[in-house]
Amino acid sequence: MPIKQRLALIAFGGNALIPENQRGLQDEQMQNAERAAQLMAHIVRKGYELIIVHGNGPQVGNLLIQMEEAVTKIPPYSLDVCNAMTEGSMGFMLERAITNELRRHSIDKEVITLITQVLVDRSDPAFEHPAKPVGPFYTKYRAQQLTREKKWAMVEDAGRGYRKVVPSPKPIDVVPKWIVRDLALAGRIVIAAGGGGIPVIINNRGFYEGVEAVIDKDYAASLIAREVKVDLFIILTGIERVCLNFGKPNEREIPVMTVEEAQKYLDEGQFPPGSMGPKIRAAIEYIKAGGKEILITDANHLKAALINRSGTRIIEDRGQSIVSPF
């Protein structure tokens, strides 16, 4: 009887390649990709087929700055195309780094990056209330000019200038989801929905059309995890464990919580929208759709978390056994 393949999906932010203390030089990003590749290879060596979803916040921000600086010489691209460009560049760095790390361990496994369109609802309320800042800071004069000429929504960031804000709609379908699944089950490492994927809508003629928006990568990862039915969904973040009362004297780490407890803490405001909130919502959606287990931790503690010695696990109920996946 053939052994059932085990699928894992790991999601991490774009700051894994451009941390706050770095400029984002190409060599820096490549070195950071190599460090990330060591963790990816560790999961593969433990017997999992792997899907990778990464963020692109710093990268797409830098690309938009480049375009603004060159706007008088080269026509700028729209945000959906910029997302595709960063999917390609970041995918290449991760592909090369992971392939080389696998070769170091004599593992013959192909890595593939998919430029991934992700469907959003054109009637999503986010389109009426753009709130996600992207790109460079502008002077008040330039912001007014862009609002007038391009109909951009702009917000002031006290003391820093004005920034463009775009919608952040919820993903409802991954266009190439069966390609992602089939490649992963065929033994390929799949890098998909980088930056949350390229947001598209279905227009009045029934065709896909790109939109100026960004999709939260944790929501996109959760959607893939649900549709592909992965066995383990890993979300890397900046802290070892999810905490209650984060940053307060009564802060408390949570090693394990049920989906019901996670929803309760979320409703109580324990997990802010701009940080842990989307990760917890993504976890809840995955478990409620029949997912098995979520692991949330940081890169430094991932190996320990994979053997139940660190991190936070989110499960369906307390009766579920917590057994090391490795």
Language-model features, listed with the residues they occupy:
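C-terminal catalytic "cap/lid" subdomain
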Residues: 2-326
